[in-house]
Amino acid sequence: MQKRFSILFVTAFFCFVNPLVRPQMLDPRIDHDDEPFSYFSQPTDVIGVMDARAGTLVSPEGYFYTGFGELMFFTGNPPVPLKQRVKTLYRGYLPINEYTYRDHDIDYNVTSFAATLDGKPESDVMNFVRVSILNRGSSAAVAHFAAGMRYTNESNMAGSTGDNRFLRPAVPKRLGQYSQLGVEWNPEWEYGFSGDGLLRDGKVMYLFPTSPAPVRSLSLKDSHNGVPKNETRKLHVQPTTPVGIVRYDITLQPGANQTLEFRIPLEPLAPDSSDVAALRSAKLDDYLNRTVQFWDSLLTRGIEITVPEQKVNDTFRANLIYDLIARDKVGDNYVQTVNKFHYHSFYLRDSSFIVRMYDASGYPEIARQALDFFAGWQQPDGNFVSQGGQFDGWGQVMWAYGQHYRITKDLDFAHKVYPSVQRAVAWLQQARRNDPLHLMPSTSPGDNENVTGHVTGHNFWALGGLKNAIILAQVLGEQQDAKAYQAEYDDFRATFIAELNKVTASSDGYMPPGLDVSSGEDWGNMLAVYPEQILDPQDPMVTATLNATRAKYEEGIMTYGGGRWLHHYLTMKNTETETIRGDQQLAVEELYALLVHTSSTHAGFEYCILPWSTRDFAQNLSPHGWFAAKFRMALRNMLVREEQDRRLHLLSVISPEWVRSGEGISVKRAPTNFGQVNFDVKFTSDGATMTLNNTFTQKPQDIVLHLPWFVNVSGVSADGKKINVANNAALLPTNVRNVQIAWQKKPGAPALSYDHAVKDYKAEYRRRYERWIRTGQNTDKALGGR
């Protein structure tokens, strides 16, 4: 059988890069076999506290960047900046960042996390960093380790922000706009030491250990190689110059280790403050254990998905935490941002998906808190807009409100938001009457589709939102509204489909980003089936759009900007559609392509990475909150999903890697629109046993159990009764407790897994790299094709 790498990673060439610009590539040796794979060449990570107003960026090198400065590390004597690209998370998913830097026989193991001293997110955030130094050699050795603070790192682009860092400070005009704590650079700052701390203009920047005693110097070098002078003074250094250096020269016997602990207040503090005293006396292990307990306790409240691939499990867990760290509590407001870095802002489009993820993950109170902030973005005319021209916000809010009710059955919430729903629908009705196409008005979103005109996706969103407005009207007994909204929906949908039919007549069925413009980026035109089903999943327009967008993939994921950049989470619009359509193999292949493009800390990105190039997202930093929410929902929907509040679907998509004798899949505490779903699947050499323990508050019409495409099924029974199989699925009674499935794997079943996908990616990258070394080219048609 022909190798399927072409489907996973190599697609027809679709990268319209200026032919005069030679592509850049990295030496494949960047990836070490003894380290977990990390796709990004310049990964950024976060340590932070749920609901705090700011977070700390763990830089590609392993430094700690805040709005006020960057603590960096050095090894050797003279000191050389430490650089360690690959990092991991404690237990694989907790927001405790770990990495090991090896210098000859000395290992420097760095562990970092953030906490507030009193456990309240509104309090000052403190960063704890432990460096454990180990001599792995067979003879004594001296370890040289140093720390120092700088304002920022080097920049190789326009602007003052360092490479792979975020802009700071930033003061928003209104809550929800981009904000960053911090200060502007000031060359007149004074620097000095006070016992165990570096002071900048009289504020503590970081605390360092005094035992063993360090060598202190205000700068790494002296202009005349003189004796260091450590009296407090102005240094007039550059923003990139490290200051406040402490160096430790430690003799270690074979197998011996030494621990150093550093503490970094996210906001500099007065040296005589009670917070500094508390930070100095705080026991790192106590706060580490509190951090572990907090997140473990939160995780055990929600959905738990376990499959026989650790990368899948850890990515699922870690990305819930990434979104919770991205949330701010400001007064009584809970502001869901996208990350604590360059996207430290509120967007209706991102937040609506993140809220849906919280609801579907078993955190309705967290979802409700975030939803309460949406109301402030309703305009006087009734529309919902968080960024100018982005009218998809109307449908996203209606959908977010409706889905929250549908999964929680919270009537108090429905009553609270319904007046704003009425105003919103009134706006839609008037907007359609005034529009020449009787659709969502022409607009310039300035993002996503990047068109000016009637945006296809805005209409899919509006229809999906209107469906949820109808549901809210019905449950609240607003029958007159429900009838009027249904009539509006029917007319709107018919008008929209007629326009789609007209437009797609000349595009082989492909639904373009704009209905009355020829340019634009694929985005909302990929939403015909999910998150609300507007068109039949098998509609020819859905199929054509799916095929047309998949033809634009590079490295197995979607592209953006006419093929110039990879786009990570945009891919999942197709993955969700494939899951619903029953395109199981495509969905599994995309699952692994998505995972390949994460860091070793399971962070996703947005775009800006060039295909088959440097794997550098530049200033478009990870982790990305919309990726986080969409990945969790994509995996959840593969295993458990609703269809139109009527059917419950189980195991829509599973990987061949999971179907091994003795292995299993477990889904626990999964909220659905029907109630809580719990099941375990155990695989044998000739089939599977499924045990269910569901608690329905509203029974589904039936349960659809999907069967893998890579097996031949010989029989299915539910609670001892034979069940017919049709279209690779079995309809189960809603009270089913035990399902027995007999099958045999088909000959030549594909070997799909995360490890295989990484291996295939690395092999293809090396192949292109070797050609690039010889010819300077890695982007011609000879290297593409299906």
Spans of model-derived segments:
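Terminal accessory carbohydrate-recognition/targeting modules of carbohydrate-active enzymes
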Residues: 22-307, 644-786
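Active-site core of glycosidic bond-cleaving carbohydrate-active enzymes
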Residues: 341-363, 370-380, 415, 419-422, ...
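Bacterial N-terminal signal peptides that target proteins for export
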Residues: 1-9
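Bacterial N-terminal signal peptides
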Residues: 8-17
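The feature captures the catalytic groove of carbohydrate-active enzymes
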Residues: 230-232, 239-284, 339-340, 383-392, ...
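An acidic-aromatic substrate-binding cleft motif
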Residues: 281-341
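Active-site acid/base region of carbohydrate-active enzymes
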Residues: 198-223, 299-325, 348-349, 379, ...
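Aromatic-rich carbohydrate-recognition surfaces in CAZymes
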Residues: 135, 174-182, 187, 191, ...
